[in-house]
Amino acid sequence: MAVAIKGNTVNANPTPGKNFYQFTHNQNTGAGGLLIIQLTMSNARSYTGCNYGGVSMTQLYTINRGGLSQRMAFYYLVDPPTGNNTLRINFNNSVWNPISIHSRSFTGSDGIGNDGKVGGQSTPNTQSLTVSQDSLIMATACSINAISTIQIPQGSNRTFATHNTNRQVGTGAISSNSGHNAGSISVRTTSTFGSVTNDRVEILGTSSADTTGGDFFMIM
């Protein structure tokens, strides 16, 4: 196996004001392409789908976090079209509150592996995820209070984007470039106080990663 190659990202915290929001994402060129998007918004509205370059993305999960009045979701697309394309998020009605968006490209990936989702627990919220050799983990967290850290694995603070959706969101945290050994990996999320969620997704590597093809840049 080989670890997936991290590519381009977009972070946004807009207020759509309509029943969709769209932006341009530049998918990196290379074998084993993968595009993911992490979303959080008020649970007054629902996601009705995402598409990239006109191709429908697969919904991994959508969760109504009633205690936080938020709806969190994860969509992905294997072998997406490369280059600059429109990523569109559709809603069941106009959205008048800010939403949290994080999209990321990969190459050299066999797609999505295991995932785990745990609602608000007293900080720190520590959970495990069983992964394959050379996988990466992405994590997101939501709280009434500020997100302090997202640790992948526990003890290793990872950078993340901070968004305000009328709740506090930490999104886009990802493992270091070296990936993980196969087994159970501990992921910790913390907030300044109170409760915090812990959602995590495995990004598979590949046994035939193309580490030389196309345009990409590394996001540490």
Residue ranges and their predicted role:
Residues 1-220:
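Primarily extracytoplasmic/secreted proteins
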